[in-house]
């Protein structure tokens, strides 16, 4: 059984974070809004979607960044390097979220990604088989396995859903009215797997997504969200 609640992975601040914290205190910079870095694997789909959470009344800075790494373990391992010299002060509310899919990751790769995230204090938004399963949950309570991303998109494009959907298209406005429904469905699926003592970060957890936790967190930082 998962022992991390709803995947709020915790751990020590990375060496890079400690160095930046010392530099920040020495320079006496004034307080700024916390920054949330979303390290996303390759595709613009996730980048385009999460950019829409950046609103004027949001009290965090949301910065989606594409990663050059396709494997989950490398994406998480190199997350600190991916943000480069950008400010990262976890003690002031900054967070790093690693957003990735099952894709060709083995269970060993997924386990390593989880282990590294815990060690570094990062968070994970994992989707199995792909990010589009999160979109699909806005329209259908999908609890049976979906073979791959193509099959997921085929379900997503059924009549009454996102019939014109293509990778990297803008879908936020169409999904927003159904977002709370998707969150509820995603969380129930995670809970069901946990009750069965099944590991979430495996190929066998299909279908599942922990994107709902990230969406809830981003919404909680918007003053206009109800």
Segments (PLM) and residue ranges:
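Glycine-rich, highly charged phosphate/nucleotide-binding loops
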Residues: 76-85
């Amino acid at each position: 059984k998962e022992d991390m609640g709803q995947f709020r992975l915790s751990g020590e601040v990375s060496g890079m974070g400690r160095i930046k914290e010392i530099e920040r205190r020495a320079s006496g910079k004034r307080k700024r809004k916390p920054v949330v870095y979303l390290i996303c694997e390759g595709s613009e789909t996730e980048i385009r979607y999460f950019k829409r959470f950046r609103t004027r009344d949001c009290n965090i800075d949301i910065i989606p960044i594409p990663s050059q790494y396709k494997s989950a373990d490398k994406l998480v391992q190199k997350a600190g390097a991916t943000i480069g010299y950008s400010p990262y002060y976890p003690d002031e509310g900054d967070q790093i979220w690693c957003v990735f899919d099952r894709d060709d990751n083995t269970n060993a790769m997924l386990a390593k990604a989880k282990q590294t995230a815990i060690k570094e204090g990062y968070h994970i938004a994992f989707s199995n088989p792909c990010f589009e399963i999160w979109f699909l949950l806005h329209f259908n309570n999908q609890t049976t396995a979906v073979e791959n991303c193509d099959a997921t998109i085929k379900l997503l494009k059924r009549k009454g859903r996102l019939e014109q959907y293509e990778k990297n298209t803008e879908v936020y406005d169409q999904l927003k009215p159904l977002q709370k429904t998707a969150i509820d469905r995603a969380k129930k699926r995670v809970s069901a797997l946990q009750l069965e003592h099944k590991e979430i970060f495996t190929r066998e957890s299909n279908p599942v997504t922990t994107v709902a936790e990230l969406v809830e967190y981003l919404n909680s930082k918007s003053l206009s969200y109800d």
